[in-house]
Amino acid sequence: MSEVVVKEQLEQYISKIERLEQEKADLSQEVKDIFQDASSHGFDVKAMKSILKLKKLDKDKLAEQDAMLELYRDTLGI
């Protein structure tokens, strides 16, 4: 490959990464704004984040986690 082609490819990769990093930052700000809006309407943001995390688990893992949590709560009388 010629140096010109390599330089152009590198510039394209860098440009794409920069664009995606900016999009990621923009999306992160949008998510933050949504949480702030939900909070201002009385929703518990911490609970919402927990729900989002739980939704990512498959049903078997979620059931296992729920069972373990219930066992620990019962053991500790909570």
Curated annotation (Swiss-Prot):
GO terms for molecular function: DNA binding. Coiled coil: none annotated. Pfam families: GapR_DNA-bd. HAMAP family: UPF0335. Belongs to the UPF0335 family. This is UPF0335 protein RMA_0160. The lineage of its organism: Bacteria, Pseudomonadati, Pseudomonadota, Alphaproteobacteria, Rickettsiales.
